[in-house]
Every structure is written in C-alpha cells, then in structure tokens.
Amino acid sequence: MRLQSDTAFLGALTNVPSGTYTVQVSLSNPEIVFLNDTGSTITANGKMCAAGAVCSVTLTAAGTPTISSFTLTATANSQQGIELDFKLKNAISLTSGALSVNFNPASPNPGVFTAFTLPRTNANLGTNQLELIEDFTGVVSLSGSTVTITSPTRGTLIAKSTSNSFFDHSPDGAICPTTSTITCVKAGQIASVDAFVKSDGTLEVKEFEPLNATQKDFVEGIVYGVSSTTQQFTMAVTDKVQAATNSLIGGLNTGDLLTVNIALAPNPFFVDSKGLSVQSSSSYSFFAGQTSASAIHPGQTVAVNVTTFVAATSTTLAAVTSDTVTLRWSRFTAAAVAPFTTQLLNVNTLPSYFFLTPASQFVVQLYPGTAGGQGITNFDGITDGSGIVPNPVSVRALFLENTGITANPAFFAAKVRQH
C-alpha cells in the first residue's frame, strides 16, 4: 500500500566499476492481505478466503526478474540514482478461483518492474536532490545533527538535519511545538521522518514529526471493519514499534489481521496533521477529540498504543486493547475526476476496502505553495493540482469522515502522485 504514493529507500552502492549494467530484483514468499470482492471463494496457497472476507496469505512465489527495458551506464566519478516501479497488479493472477503470484510473467504479459533514472520528471525537488522518502516511522537515536530512525519492519534510516529541516508538533501537541528546532528531538521517541535522497546517496531530513515521547508498543494498520456498539474495530497491520522492554507485540507481524478494543476510558482521539492546516476544516472534529469507534471508518489508517495483547488462535484474530488512537495516512489509488484546481481534487472508484459506492465522488483538499515547503502537498509527476489529468492518481491523505459519509472535503492530501 505504501508504495502507491510513496517511495522506499533500498540503499546506496559505492565504488561501482565503469560499465553497462542491468537491474535484477530478488523476491520470495510474498505475504498479501486482500479483500475478496470477487463474489466467490478464492483459494490462495491452500487457504480458503470467503467472498467478502479480508484474508492474509503467504505465497510460495519466488523470482529474480531482470528489467530488460533498462540499462545503466556507470562512468568514473559519476553519481546516479535509479528508481524501480513495482506493479503488483501485473504479478497477480486469478484462475479458476485460485490466486497466484508470478514475479516474472511470460511475454506478452506486462512486466512487474520498470526502472528509470532519478530525479523523475516533475518530481518537484531541489538541486542535488534525487527523491523524497516519506513517513519512515521508528525509534529515534541522535548524534549531533544526525537523526537515526530504527524500524523493526523497514530497517534503519540515517539522515542529517539542516537549517532547512522542519519540525512538526506531535499529534497531542506536547512535543516539538510551533517553530521548534532539532533541540526537541530526543532519543527514544517514536517519530516519522521525511528525508531527501541526495545525489551522493546520503539523506537529509526534510521533516521530523514525533508521534510518542517514549518507545512503547505502537501498531499501525488499515481499518477494514468497525463495530461501534462494542467499541471495536479490525485492521490489517502495516507497521509497528515495540516497547524497549517487556513488549507485548513481539509475535505480531505486518500483514497480520488484528482486533482493536478501545479502552473503557480512552484518551480523546488524535489526528496526525503533519504540518497541514487540517484543524481549520469542519471535518477535523469528526475524529479529533472523539472517543467512540463510530468516528472510525474502513479505509482509514490508524495507529494505536497497546495496553494489552491476546495472541491469535486458529479461529480468532489477535486482539489488543488501546487507550490512544491516532488517525494517520491512508494511501490509495483512485480515478481523478475533473475539474482540477490547485486546491481541490475530486476522486471516485476508491479501493473496495473503503466499502463505498464506486461512482461516489469525494473531495480531496490540496495545500498549494512553494514545492518542498512546510504544510504543502507534495506532488509527483505534476507541478501542482491544476496539472492533474483524468488518469489514476495515488494519494496519501487523512481520511476524515462523518457517520453519514457526507464530509466535504473528506480527504486532506500530503502527497499526490499522477500516473
């Protein structure tokens, strides 16, 4: 889900001999979480997935596809960046009710990977910037102006803070208040970082946002079911951070399905605004300050602090109790619908796990301004919202909705990628 709108950093290579190279990718044992919206039961690696169910399966597919359409010519003392585009749709097939994955489908089927050099056209980056890595979440350590974020699910990101780096306040407003500097960054915080990939392969902090003051059990996921009568919802786990000691969630993995029980007296819900002026919208209160599961909707991404944990069994999902629920960033691909302006984008045909009528249109709030500025929507492939064309767009946005599904706007975009 993350790579629909965002980019992951795979690393930097040094001392590459001069020559011409192809790119080969090694993949194995993919875990896939999906909503079976086909109307019939699906079988995946021997596991049955009923119609209308959300299922998590690990497949045995493996492969080392070579991206034949791309070659890299390395010369002495040159610095180059390469980006890979992974098209999961081209790897998945459904035949006679059986779901399978092939990372190297035979011609004339479309390839799973394409590659290109960086920076991309209309990437809206500055001098010596190749790409922007966004929302890398983990535990903070600090050495001078160098910030390290360690994630149990995504590895480690090391980036240098500069005078151009932004520091957003935490969702509860207690950490890094307005006009903060790196002095508000403390070891042991849970934080989200955006970082520029520089032409020399190093990373520079664009934006730092603390999420928790201390390292504790913290789980993020995509909501797919809500029961407001029982103060309960279900989600697919997309990220986690474990407490420094005595973690309850060591056996919980990304891709697992999880039941979340809201505590009897929870903290008022928070919204991770990431510097966007979301608070000024009437939609903000649909989530912020609430304490009931009725404020939560399928398709939202939320983070929860874990106070109790019960492991999964063969018949029941793993379950946690949480006293703190924070709205974070939904990532999805949808159809862009005209008209397009610098401030508003209309979309329909959202993914089926939102459980919304495909033809229904929803308004996405955009935040125009100087590219790379604080509180501004990042655009990839277009200069601003007025350049959007009626093709699919991938969006990372806050989803703020009411019980009648009439919020306008319903989405507040930190990122828009034009396809």
Q: Across the structure, where does each feature detected by a protein language model lie?
A:
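A short, solvent-exposed, low-complexity linear motif enriched for acidic/polar residues
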Residues: 1-231, 236-241, 250, 258-260, ...
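Short acidic/His/Gly/Ser-rich catalytic and metal-binding motifs that mark active-site loops
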Residues: 244
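Single-stranded RNA-binding regions, centering on S1/OB-family and related RNA-binding modules
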Residues: 255
